[in-house]
Regions:
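Short helix/turn-capping signatures at newly exposed starts of structured segments
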Residues: 23-46
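A short Gly-Trp-Pro
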Residues: 35, 44-78, 84-164
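Bacterial Sec-dependent signal peptides at the C-terminal "C-region" and cleavage site
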Residues: 2-31
């Protein structure tokens, strides 16, 4: 019995070591340099508590609670942290999810896509490429022409209405 427990313990420790080392090797942000970098204290000073929780701690706002999920005005959606233009209202659509949804980013380099295996799900997380703010996730169930659904947190966005 003692031998069985020792073997099981060894297997558990080995599995933990392998999973921890795998995460470091596969870091998708390893070679990315964010151009806007602030300390946690600096982010807390410029963001509301909810903005900080979502963008810096990778949380998610409640569905149907954000300012932009029903916004139909024309304009540009920007990162709330660094003001980088991210999405154009021309690519926004009603997804029925309770979060603002877009089928295309304003520019492919505006966002970063990284694997997110949290909560037992396999998803793709979306970050601002300039400051690393968590924006939301992208799914492959969107409309044409891309078939993508960028599902974003309103609180991670600023909206700049068209001047017209």
């Amino acid at each position: 019995m003692k031998t069985v427990l020792v073997i099981l313990g060894f297997i558990c420790v080995l599995g933990l070591v392998i999973s921890l080392s795998k995460g470091k090797e596969d870091d998708p942000l390893k070679n990315h340099k964010f151009t806007v970098v602030k300390t946690e204290a600096e982010w807390r000073k410029i963001l509301t508590p909810e903005q900080y929780k979502v963008t810096r701690q990778r949380s998610t706002e409640l569905a149907c609670s954000g300012a932009y999920w029903k916004n139909h005005e024309k304009g540009i959606y920007k990162c709330v942290c660094c003001k980088l233009p991210l999405f154009d209202s021309k690519t926004k659509f009603e997804s029925g999810t309770g979060w603002p949804s877009f089928y295309k980013a304003i520019h492919k380099d505006a966002i970063l896509e990284i694997p997110d295996d949290s909560f037992g799900m396999s998803r793709t997380e979306i970050l601002c490429s300039r400051c690393g703010a968590h924006l939301g996730h992208v799914f492959d169930d969107g409309p044409r022409p891309t078939g993508l659904r960028y599902c974003l947190n309103s609180v991670a966005l600023d909206f700049e209405k068209d001047a017209k």
